[in-house]
Amino acid sequence: MNPLVYFSSSSENTHRFVEKLSLPAMRIPIAGARSKLLMETPYILIVPSYGGGSAVGAVPIQVIRFLNDPQNRAFLRGVIAAGNTNFGAAYGIAGDIIAKKCQVPFLYRFELLGTTQDVANVRQGVTAFWQRQN
């Protein structure tokens, strides 16, 4: 199965969610300038949403840098976003922004650490997505 690629800040919320998935995953480094992740296969991106409900600053800078690499952008096949429902329409907005800009499907959104149901939905959805791609 193709990997997930994710970013998680020092809060580790997204990291903990990805660990629960028990799927192959690679992490975008927090200190992006010191170590670079370069993808060589198609992947699905899992990204937290920042910015407190605003589109400005919603996509973490490390993710922007990662996707600014043409090779990484070329292998992106879909996006999943974490967010906070307190932000209303901006809940998981980083996923909306990336999906639109990179022209890939926005596959799922979950709140903060995600629920047991979110984990099951993402695991099943990712598996089905890759089966349809192959």
UniProtKB/Swiss-Prot annotation:
Stored Pfam families: Flavodoxin_NdrI
Listed GO MF terms: FMN binding
Domain of life where this protein originates: Bacteria
GO biological process: protein modification process
Purpose of the protein: Probably involved in ribonucleotide reductase function.
Family: Belongs to the NrdI family.
PANTHER family: PROTEIN NRDI
Matching HAMAP family: NrdI (MF_00128)
Name of the protein in question: Protein NrdI
